[in-house]
Amino acid sequence: MSNASGGGPRPRRRDGVDPALRSRARRRALQAVYAWQISGGVAKQVIAHFAHEQAYEVADLAYFEDLVEGVLTHCAELDEKLTPYLDRTIEEVDAIERAVLRLGAYELLYRQDVPYRVVINEAIMTAKRFGSKYGHTYVNGVLDRAALALRKVEVLG
């Protein structure tokens, strides 16, 4: 597969993961989690809708499905892990930032294969793209403190 500039294959990590495709999967997962939060839909229906409607855009479909199913399945636990680092209740956090935080918390807890810095950076970039003007700074602060608690050895190592 060639990159957008036509200059050869897209860069991949040693494990074969294409970071650009993962980023796209995260953006689509954000949209799915946001839709779920707003509609209260069933997890399988939300995933099926986004996987079907945007199949050509969800480049890493397996990762997209893992993120969405993971957040929807573990939502109460993720909220509990985030709560000590919030300055308000999780329900009072803007819906986009709430979805970004839940996705970030899921990756920090359950996707140890993804470095914490990547999780935080991707969350910041997603919040900048979809969130409020300063939402990305809030996301950064919350996830930075959560990472210290959830991945202390990695963060301090």
From Swiss-Prot:
Keyword hit for Hydrolase: no
Entries under InterPro entries matching the protein: NusB-like_sf, NusB_fam, NusB_RsmB_TIM44
Keywords: RNA-binding, Transcription, Transcription antitermination, Transcription regulation
Top-level division of the source organism's lineage: Bacteria
GO CC terms, sorted: cytosol
A single BP term in Gene Ontology: DNA-templated transcription termination
Any one GO MF annotation of this record: RNA binding
Pfam families in UniProt: NusB (PF01029)
Disulphide-bonded residues: none
Gene3D superfamilies, per the entry: NusB-like
Known function: Involved in transcription antitermination. Required for transcription of ribosomal RNA (rRNA) genes. Binds specifically to the boxA antiterminator sequence of the ribosomal RNA (rrn) operons.
Family of the protein in this entry: Belongs to the NusB family.
Protein name: Transcription antitermination protein NusB
Species for this entry: Xylella fastidiosa (strain 9a5c)
